Every structure is written in structure tokens, then in C-alpha cells.
Amino acid sequence: MRLLITRPQPDGARTAAALAAHGHEAVLAPLLRIEPVAAAFGRGPWDGAVMTSANAARALATHPRRAEIVALPAFVVGGRTSEAARETGFDHITSADGDADDLVRLIKRQSATALL
């Protein structure tokens, strides 16, 4: 089967490889490009950083305040985001292993109040 993959990179390539492993032909045609910006986060202090996607974790890799941010505990939605957070430099990562609702419940259980 020939399939059109519209995800941005590098996720599109990963999806294409998984499909190829099952005998499908993937055509990569990303519909958007993820462009990190150096957002101003304010002074803090923060109890942790929340990431709902691997793209969010990847964006922090080039942020001017990266060293300060990766020193925080990270609360992430799932496995891919956890992996990206680790690659960005986070050492203390807690994953909800689910969806955004699971992440909210996890954060409430951790009693974190000031989150980035």
C-alpha cells in the first residue's frame, strides 16, 4: 500500500520507516515545519517543566536558558517525549505514559504548582 505521510520531520521519517517495515511505501510530504523560538519564560522559580510533545522538548535544546531549564524536573506526556527530554539534557523525567489528561493527573499528584 502507498501512503502519504504529512507529519513534520523528524517524526515523518520515523513513521515512514515503521510503515516500510510492514511492507508499505511511504511518501513524505510534511505539511508544516517546527520552528523553535526563544520564548521569554519570566524569572521563576519553577517546580518543573511540562512537555506535551517531543517537539517541545527538542525546542528547548536550543533555548538560550537551556542549562537552567534542563535542571528542572520534567513532566512529560509519554515515551517519545521522555526520550526527547533526555536527549535535550533533562535527568529527572516523570512520564504520564498516556495522554494530556493523564499528564494533568500526574502533575496534580506531584503537587507541583509553579510550572514552566
Region spans (language model):
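Signature of uroporphyrinogen-III synthase
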Residues: 1-116
